[in-house]
Amino acid sequence: MALLSLRNVTRRFGGVVALDGVSFDVVEGQIAGLIGPNGAGKTTAFNVITRLYTPDSGDVVFRGESLLRSPVHGIVRRGIARTFQNVELFRTMTVLDNVLVGAHTRGRDATGQALEAIDYVGLRQIAERPVAGLPYGTLKRVELARALVAGPKLLLLDEPAGGLNHEEVEELGRFIQQIRDDYELTVLLVEHHMNLVMGISDHVHVLNFGRMIAQGTPAEVRANPDVIEAYLGTDDGTGRDA
């Protein structure tokens, strides 16, 4: 059953068509990958899903209801949380206070939930430290804890492996699968690291110049000639041209 559906979504920026009639489903309980070259429209799709952008046409349906009637601040309460390509945190606030921003409730219950999420991502020992000066990989875990404390049904991860080395990327893949299982949620993943996407995704969607050019299992996508030409021609594990 589809938890999320984009239905013929188009989004323009002046004369540039960032998304051109894009349609795809994300099945509940799965990890789905959304891939494509730089500028393909992946982050724009995330921004449409989370209502930061309104599509020029088409619809976004979540749990059977259109999201286009929801305000931006209502998306988290609908059950969608996300991380960003560039980490978005309050640098003068502590790890705990940053995670509390994502909590639905306030007071003692919220603090307990936030500490539980912080502990889950392995940062309990620095919960009271300001995030300024923390390593980039740690900041990404803080952002992930903030997303998890909201109790989402759908978790959007925008390039979570950015800045990580090979061993850290492998660990991240296992962690994303663990999150899916432990929190019983669905994951939509935008990522340039092909080994990560193909290794953990149940289904992969491929964008190129704002159009959906392929969808299927990792094996099907890897074998698709259009994908090979557009994106997977390199074999360095990153999907980037040398």
What name fits each language-model region?
Residues 1-242:
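Glycine-rich phosphate-binding loops of nucleotide-dependent enzymes
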